[in-house]
């Protein structure tokens, strides 16, 4: 899970949490926290694609010359399978026979749950693994007795890729006022805020 979260950090240019933090969540919430992961068996898919490729070559060899439409379709399939084989072979070299492509970390409390973190390996975006992973995550929440499953926030404009993705699950959107600070001591707040900014600037330099 930590690996796919690192992929998300790199893709978005942000810093999220450490592996130790995710472990702390799981330890703290125990049976009320779980991770859902999706794996892609590259080696199996490579083997299956090679078998399809061999059959395609056989069909091409036995395709009549006057069957132009069928031959054209087979030629296109041949090119597509060659590209897939090349891609899968590269993936096996990079990731091995099996790779985790995406995952979620969820915490349950009361009759609801929060999908707190979700990550995806961009190299396998084409598989659209998050769609099934999120579905299975929410399915698990309902099996545990939850009446709702919080999918997290979206853009305020109700536009963008995140909205398009979450819209598939027919969510109910709740709009809140947002985050803000209410200083109970103006003097201490100003001092603390300046100190906080300096720490952030220092940490940013060391990354």
Predicted feature descriptions by range:
Residues 13-17, 60-64, 130-131, 139-141, ...:
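Glycine-rich loops and low-complexity Gly/Arg-rich segments
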Residues 96-171:
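Acyl-donor binding region in acyl/amide transferases
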Residues 1-125:
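A conserved beta-strand-loop-helix scaffold within acyl/acetyltransferase catalytic domains
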Residues 24-32, 45-53, 139, 164-165, ...:
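Short amphipathic alpha-helical patches
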Residues 20-24, 67-69, 134-138, 145-149, ...:
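Short C-terminal domain-edge/linker segments immediately following a structured domain
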Residues 144-207:
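Active-site/acyl-donor-binding loops of N-acyltransferases
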Residues 3, 9-10, 18-19, 112, ...:
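Aromatic-enriched hydrophobic runs in primary sequence
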Residues 18, 39, 53-55, 118, ...:
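General N-terminal targeting signals
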